[in-house]
């Protein structure tokens, strides 16, 4: 029988639980989530268990990172299933605050970052997103005080933004990126995949196929612009409307013109039906 994790929903209870977990100088890893957990989240938990002696998972659907026209109300809430997954993985602690705990009356602060947060990717189409992400992640780091925190590479710009924030503000948290977990047909696992109709689910694999084809052509010596144009045609033909499909420096997210400019990451965001998906691959 799996040991049940400690579930806390208030800051005093969190502090008491952390004091217990931290006994004997145990190292602590945090996996921040918004719930609706899938195998990608589970892979983060398993990596966390390899990297630290204790693992905490936060589940908080952060209203501050959703614009008024986005899917906050419709975002899947699957507490029972999430708890079952985390219990099976023998997580030590679940931090599950509500919005009033995270943003109490009179809350008037925000962490705003530059650098990767202004790369012209997600920030161009979701201008309030990273202000919401950095603020809530900064609060989670202050509340949980982990030694390390794990984020998936699927949200690649977010990973770079959070890592930059942690370094710049001397937060004492090592931000660790984990490889994208994909379905058997290549689609990157995402809580939003459940929004896809059967037809759109089948077509959605074009995102990964397009990225991998472009990466292959760039590695073979084709110009980046030409490789991306071919992949854009493939993705558009599958029914997607592309927000961006770009080659960026894998660390700074600055635009790159050729492989000589440094390690390259190809990133895409596109909508099929009403579902917006993101993905990326290394070159």
UniProtKB/Swiss-Prot annotation:
Indicate the residues that form the catalytic site. Answer: 41 (proton donor)
InterPro entries, sorted: Pantoate_ligase, Pantoate_ligase_C, Rossmann-like_a/b/a_fold
Amino acids binding beta-alanine:
65
Q: Where does (R)-pantoate bind?
A: 65, 158
Which pathway does this chain act in?
Cofactor biosynthesis; (R)-pantothenate biosynthesis; (R)-pantothenate from (R)-pantoate and beta-alanine: step 1/1
Q: Which reaction does it catalyse?
A: (R)-pantoate + beta-alanine + ATP = (R)-pantothenate + AMP + diphosphate + H(+)
GO terms classed as biological process:
pantothenate biosynthetic process
Known EC number(s)?
Answer: 6.3.2.1
**Keyword Ligase in annotation:** yes
Q: Name one GO molecular function term.
A: pantoate-beta-alanine ligase activity
Query: What GO terms fall under cellular component here?
Result: cytosol
Highest taxon listed in the record's lineage: Bacteria
| Alphabetical UniProt keywords | ATP-binding, Cytoplasm, Ligase, Nucleotide-binding, Pantothenate biosynthesis
Q: Where in the cell is it found?
A: Cytoplasm
- What is the annotated signal peptide range for this record? none
Residues binding ATP, per UniProt: 34-41, 152-155, 181, 189-192
Q: Which SUPFAM superfamilies match?
A: Nucleotidylyl transferase
Q: What does this protein do?
A: Catalyzes the condensation of pantoate with beta-alanine in an ATP-dependent reaction via a pantoyl-adenylate intermediate.
The text of the family note is:
Belongs to the pantothenate synthetase family.
| Subunit structure of this chain's protein | Homodimer.
The record's misc note reads:
The reaction proceeds by a bi uni uni bi ping pong mechanism.
HAMAP family from the UniProt entry: PanC (MF_00158)
Q: What is this protein called?
A: Pantothenate synthetase
Q: What is the organism field in this record? A: Rhodopseudomonas palustris (strain BisB18)
**Gene name in the database record:** panC
